[in-house]
Amino acid sequence: MPPPTFLLGLLLLLLLAAAAPAPASATPERDAYALSRLKASLVPSATNSTSAPLSDWDPAATPPAHCAFTGVTCDAATSRVVAINLTAVPLHGGALPPEVALLDALASLTVANCYLRGRLPPALASMPALRHLNLSNNNLSGPFPPPPPAAYFPALEIVDVYNNNLSGPLPPLGAPHARSLRYLHLGGNYFNGSIPDTFGDLAALEYLGLNGNALSGRVPPSLSRLSRLREMYVGYYNQYSGGVPREFGALQSLVRLDMSSCTLTGPIPPELARLSRLDTLFLALNQLTGEIPPELGALTSLRSLDLSINDLAGEIPASFAALTNLKLLNLFRNHLRGEIPAFLGDFPFLEVLQVWDNNLTGPLPPALGRNGRLKTLDVTSNHLTGTIPPDLCAGRNLQLLVLMDNGFFGSIPESLGDCKTLTRVRLGKNFLTGPVPAGLFDLPQANMLELTDNMLTGELPDVIAGDKIGMLMLGNNRIGGRIPAAIGNLPALQTLSLESNNFSGPLPPEIGRLRNLTRLNASGNALTGGIPRELMGCASLGAVDLSRNGLTGEIPDTVTSLKILCTLNVSRNRLSGELPAAMANMTSLTTLDVSYNQLSGPVPMQGQFLVFNESSFVGNPGLCSACPPSSGGARSPFSLRRWDSKKLLVWLVVLLTLLVLAVLGARKAHEAWREAARRRSGAWKMTAFQKLDFSADDVVECLKEDNIIGKGGAGIVYHGVTRGGAELAIKRLVGRGCGDHDRGFTAEVTTLGRIRHRNIVRLLGFVSNREANLLLYEYMPNGSLGEMLHGGKGGHLGWEARARVAAEAARGLCYLHHDCAPRIIHRDVKSNNILLDSAFEAHVADFGLAKFLGGGGATSECMSAIAGSYGYIAPEYAYTLRVDEKSDVYSFGVVLLELITGRRPVGSFGDGVDIVHWVRKVTADAAAAEEPVLLVADRRLAPEPVPLLADLYRVAMACVEEASTARPTMREVVHMLSTSAAAQPDVPHALCKVVD
């Protein structure tokens, strides 16, 4: 037994040790100091006026007072900080200071949605106790912390840095680092390079999110070693080589696999059938080939399967009969053949079936919809036949029904008229017969009813209603009777298509109540009576076709009040009287056809009448271009546009001179052509739209690989510097050659070359031969708005600059829509088509896809082969396949949201969510916030000017309204944006004009 004196001495030493200060690295005082440095580096939100955030974080506080700080949790025994959660604190910027690593007992650090900027402190990587790190939805940049000499994240279990601006290679996690990691979300950043093989060593990993980066290389098969992995998201904006690793069949715990939109090739590996727990498989938007493996029928837990937009062939496997838990099946835009299996109609949970744009045949499953859950059915553009199943809306949940462009026959089920949840009905281009169910004209949620190109009969009901219906299309059927007055009860109607039917009686005057109507086509019927004067109430009309009817009376002078009317066709009626003289002042009217009527009097020889073809007036014996007073009005059928003898003589001399010159020129041209043909297959010819100090050869010299600055679907763009020092942007169009065979293209480009506007990229000219067209644009040294926002330079474009860019781009689009003659729809408005000059002034670019309104019989809605870019396309295009000015407005609204949020329009918001839906959801979920826009504003920038951002936000949300009729015009957008002082240009706005 030790002596008592020894015990007393030992006890004294223990007491002294307890009383002595702990090492500096392990004291509550040091924790308090680290918290004070963290507070000093954070920026409070300007919207919180009642109390400053973190006001209770008193730098002078002594332990354990720091344990009561907002968002701080301490160990009760030691007063050491073990958790920090500032997500609910209204912060608006700042950075993580390196002193945060002094919190060596910290197990959980959550600072999400706080607008953090700057780089991640390297010392984070060596924090010994850190298990939970959540820095998602900030503006952090730079690389992920590299491995320190000591252990790398030794205790880490959860990492979430989703939606930041981190770049560089992915962190080298895995053996021997971070072996305890369970959750890893690095998505929505700018990481590049390949996925490290070492990720396969993260044996505890359950969640892997790498989506929305810029990764490349092959998806490593080593990931198949992650035996506990439940969710894997590796697609969207990543561009891998190769296909889906067949080794992934070993991921026995996997529940969700999303590899959409990441350039995968090759077949779908049948080994995926071993993933028995899988409930979601998304492989859409890739280049996968081959047939759908029948082995996938073993995935009996599957609830969502999306293989759309690939190059898959073959039939829908019969083995899919076992997939009875499916809620969503998307197979559209492939090359599938065979029938839609009948067993799909028996699936009890099926909500979405989309197989459009394939080569499918046979009938629809007769039991489809009986489960009561079906919401979306789209089988467009196949070769399906049979009748429409009667129970599609048995559960009153059906919203989207699109069966167009098939071979369906029989009648439209009456049950569809009782389906009040329907928003879109498209049954066109089939062989449907019988009357249209009356209920289809009274669907409260419907925004479109399209039944064109069938053999429908009967009459329209007296009750027609619907506050949301924007398109009513019944053309090319056999519907008869009168057009009911109730047609005027559709306030949102934009398109009314009744052509080629058997309608009789007058055009109801109530049609004048349709303020938003842009297109009216009632041609090819048996209408009688006059053109109603009330038509002037349709102030938005762009195209009217009432041809091939039995209309009588005069053309009402009220038609001249339709200020944006582009096309008017009233040919082949029995109209009489004179043409309203004021029609000469309708500058928007580019197409007029009054042929084969009983009109009389003079054709005005001024204004718009100078651009109309003579064929527009034929068949009216009483019309003439100059009626002599002594003639008493009697005219020859051939008196129209009669020239007096002096004018005729002048023109004959001119024509004869031109003919002589043409013969001489042709002889010289033939000799020159023969000489050129010996030198090369096709000489380059330059057409200039202004004085240029360079030649076609100078331009061609610039077509070098090193000069490429952009590639897209329309062509390749080169940065050219001619020998004279002129800088150009040269766009070489894909698949276009020029010559006599392509005069339409030449005429279109020539018209574009006449456009002069401060905020439109000027087309200087074009160079062509028989193999290629080169468009020559003024060079914009600061690139595109898209590059500025998403290419790592976003922080360099401040809020005021963004507001000015928005206003300037809006003015350019406004000019195209409202001041050009003919008016122009851009059709591909996006941030990459808004270019910035040396002063960062915005210029709208790329009219390779633009179509003219009113030209050549076009209407205000043009059929589109290419209707814009993914993420920018207006929702109505999905069911109209047409674009108009409001489509451009929607796309511009998406650009505004890019300016506000700093985010790309798609790819970082989750499955099937774009920027519009994300902004709506985030701002709706936080209705109590002072300004909802602050919840989505770009966090890479300093605190926002709230009034300016609020204005931009309101304009953006107006532009992306679901119903196109609710969107403003670009002229209205310009007016709304001009109310912000920051949106005003530094110099006066240049005059807009088209030069001859």
From Swiss-Prot:
Compartments in which it is found: Membrane
GO BP annotations, alphabetical order: cell differentiation; regulation of floral meristem growth; specification of floral organ number
Catalytically driven reaction(s): L-seryl-[protein] + ATP = O-phospho-L-seryl-[protein] + ADP + H(+); L-threonyl-[protein] + ATP = O-phospho-L-threonyl-[protein] + ADP + H(+)
Enzyme Commission code(s) on record: 2.7.11.1
Gene3D superfamilies: Phosphorylase Kinase, domain 1, Ribonuclease Inhibitor, Transferase(Phosphotransferase) domain 1
Keyword flag Signal: yes
Domain (Protein kinase): residue spans on this chain: 703-978
Keywords: ATP-binding, Developmental protein, Differentiation, Kinase, Leucine-rich repeat, Membrane, Nucleotide-binding, Receptor, Repeat, Serine/threonine-protein kinase, Signal, Transferase, Transmembrane, Transmembrane helix
Signal peptide positions (record): 1-26
Major site of localization recorded for this protein: membrane
GO molecular function terms noted in the UniProt entry: ATP binding; protein serine kinase activity; protein serine/threonine kinase activity; receptor serine/threonine kinase binding
Positions of transmembrane segments: 646-666
Keyword Repeat applies: yes
Active site: D828
Phenotype upon gene inactivation: Fasciation. Flattened and wider ears with irregular rows of seeds. Thicker rachis of tassels and increased floral organ numbers. Reduced vegetative growth.
GO CC field: membrane
Extent of the LRR repeats: 78-103, 104-127, 128-151, 153-178, 180-201, 202-226, 251-275, 276-299, 300-323, 325-349, 351-371, 372-395, 397-419, 420-443, 445-466, 467-490, 491-514, 516-538, 539-562, 563-586, 587-611
Tissue expression from the record: Highly expressed in the apex of the vegetative seedlings. Lower expression in young leaves, ears and tassels, embryos and roots. Not expressed in the shoot meristem itself. Detected in the three outermost layers of the inflorescence meristem, and on its flanks at positions of prospective spikelet pair meristems. Not confined to meristematic cells but also detected in primordia of glumes, lemmas and stamens.
Binding site for ATP: I709, G710, K711, G712, G713, A714, G715, I716, V717, K731
InterPro entries named among the record's database cross-references: Kinase-like_dom_sf (IPR011009), Leu-rich_rpt (IPR001611), Leu-rich_rpt_typical-subtyp (IPR003591), LRR_dom_sf (IPR032675), LRR_N_plant-typ (IPR013210), Plant_RL_S/T_kinase (IPR051716), Prot_kinase_dom (IPR000719), Ser-Thr/Tyr_kinase_cat_dom (IPR001245)
Function: Receptor-like kinase protein that regulates meristem size during inflorescence and flower development. Promotes vegetative meristem growth and restricts inflorescence and floral meristem growth. Based on additive and synergistic phenotypes of double mutants, it is probable that unlike CLV1 and CLV2 in A.thaliana, TD1 and FAE2 do not function exclusively in a single pathway. However, KN-1 and TD1 do function in a linear pathway to maintain vegetative meristem homeostasis, but they may interact with different partners during development.
Family: Belongs to the protein kinase superfamily. Ser/Thr protein kinase family.
Protein name: Leucine-rich repeat receptor-like kinase protein THICK TASSEL DWARF1
Organism annotation: Zea mays (Maize)
Lineage: Eukaryota, Viridiplantae, Streptophyta, Embryophyta, Tracheophyta
